[in-house]
Regions:
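C-terminal capping alpha-helices of c-type cytochrome domains
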Residues: 93-107, 120-145, 242-262, 272-300
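Extended surface/linker regions that mediate inter-domain or inter-protein docking
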Residues: 128-188, 203, 271, 281-290
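Detector for the c-type heme attachment site
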Residues: 52-58, 102-103, 137-138, 200-206, ...
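Gly/Gly-Pro-rich "capping" loops immediately C-terminal to redox-active cysteine motifs
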Residues: 37-38, 43, 56-94, 112-126, ...
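Bacterial N-terminal signal peptides
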Residues: 8-19
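N-terminal secretory signal peptides that target proteins for export/translocation
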Residues: 1-6
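Electrostatic cytochrome c docking/interface patches
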Residues: 23-45, 163-192, 239, 309-313
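The canonical Cys-X-X-Cys-His
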Residues: 40, 46-56, 97, 132, ...
Length: 313
């Protein structure tokens, strides 16, 4: 057995042990107990909520917001989503939460910037949104005011967001493709809704809209000054040489087929979220991802570059 094969076998054995172990809560979030909370926790992990809404570098409290997201439009700060009534979402109703994720509108009727991936969360099923809401309501409340975004002058007016949404946003729940298998559809739901993979892995236009012709093809201007890799099955610039089993192992353990390991934001995504998903869901994600149209788009992910205001792919 060669080195790569041995590494994959070792990772697969480790995966089977971890998958059989109890799931530990990310950070200081409370573990779920009843079925709806357990479902909400699972979606919470799949969606990477902890990573975006917790300022880990500043040792911030779980889900209290404050983490910075640098983009070509300026710097966004993730909000407090704990059930604190004054600074979090404690005064929200369930329908406010559903509307925020389904339509990208806050309880006051203000439109959210698409830095909040409601453009993908809109595809979540109603029961999943309610479960996620129940789980967030069960977390400890933290009183921490939200920070003000630091945006370029042309991005400061929310009045333009209504027009942006009319041009680039299509709300609606994910509809299964009857021509595909149940596993494929489950993978599509996780990738295109719950885990919102395309929000990071898809290039954007100068308007901030996702490039539909290069979905998941990687980008030079990803979040937090990073270049995000092409994850389409293109054999030259993507992951077309990967096997489904190798991709599932990577999503659970961070170990690549070549023996290298995930780093940076992807390591965080795996550690806080994907590694807690069931093996059948990881296999479904792999099946779907490797069935996507291949897109030739070389992205040198080893390099880091500052994201400048107004710079796009």
């Amino acid at each position: 057995m060669n080195r790569v094969g041995a590494l994959q076998l070792g990772a697969l054995l480790w995966l089977s042990v971890v998958a059989a172990s109890p799931v530990q809560a990310a950070g200081n979030t409370a573990p779920a107990v009843d079925p709806q909370l357990a479902r909400g926790e699972y979606l919470f992990r799949a969606g990477g909520c902890y990573g975006c809404h917790t300022d880990v570098e500043a040792r911030g409290r779980a889900l209290a917001g404050g983490r910075a997201l640098d983009t070509p439009f300026g710097r966004f700060y993730a909000p407090n989503i704990t059930p604190d009534a004054e600074t979090g979402i404690g005064a929200w109703r369930e329908q406010d939460f559903v509307r925020a994720l389904r339509e990208g509108v806050d309880p006051r009727g203000e439109h959210y910037y698409p830095a909040f991936p409601y453009t993908t969360y809109t595809r979540l099923a109603d029961d999943d949104l309610r479960a996620l809401w129940a789980y967030l309501r069960a977390q400890p409340a933290v009183q921490q005011p939200n920070r003000t975004h630091q945006l370029a002058w042309y991005a400061r007016s929310r009045s333009l967001l209504r027009l942006w949404k009319e041009l680039y946003f299509t709300p609606g729940v994910y509809r299964p493709d009857p021509s595909q298998s149940a596993a494929w559809n489950r993978g599509a739901y996780l990738v295109e809704a719950a885990a919102h993979c395309g929000e990071c892995h898809t290039p954007r236009s100068w308007t901030g809209a996702l490039d539909g012709e290069r979905r998941h093809a990687g980008t030079r201007t990803g979040p937090e000054d990073t270049m995000v890799p092409n994850v389409t099955p293109d054999r030259g610039t993507g992951i077309g040489r990967w096997r489904a089993s190798g991709l599932a192992i990577y999503l659970q353990s961070g170990l690549r087929p070549d023996g290298d390991s995930a780093s940076g934001l992807m390591a965080e995504v795996i550690d806080n979220g994907l590694r807690h998903l069931r093996p059948d869901d990881l296999a479904a994600i792999a099946e779907y991802v490797l069935s996507m149209p291949p897109v030739n788009n070389p992205v040198r992910t080893a390099d880091r570059k500052p994201v400048k205001k107004g710079e796009f792919d």
